[in-house]
Amino acid sequence: GATLVVKEKIMTHGVQHAETKFYVDLNGEDSSTNVVSRSVAKEDSTQVFYSQINGNNKCAGHTECDAIIMDRATVKAIPALEANNLEASLIHEAAIGKIAGEQLIKLMTLGLTEAEAEEQIVNGFLK
């Protein structure tokens, strides 16, 4: 079976708008996909992530969206799964949240400013 792997990394700031849409049809026996999005939204930016996986045969599909939201930004994650075969195994995960205060404090105790600590966390998240 064929395998499709999609990995995206997005950072928006200012009034930028990013929208991604992934539609995957798993038609072949033992086909699979892994669609992963990691993003950071800052200031007044907006992001929309949409993924649709259709399991039309014996297959495995996974979609994941993890986002850090900052300032006044907005993030929307819309994962959709459709199993059209008894042997289709489909999973979706989505998590949106701010940088944890304890992460910032830990890095600041090592001598980083708050801005430097945020930058380190964001860079590590997107790697």
Language-model segments: residues:
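Conserved beta-strand/loop scaffold segments within soluble protein domains that form the structured core
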Residues: G1-L112, V122-K127
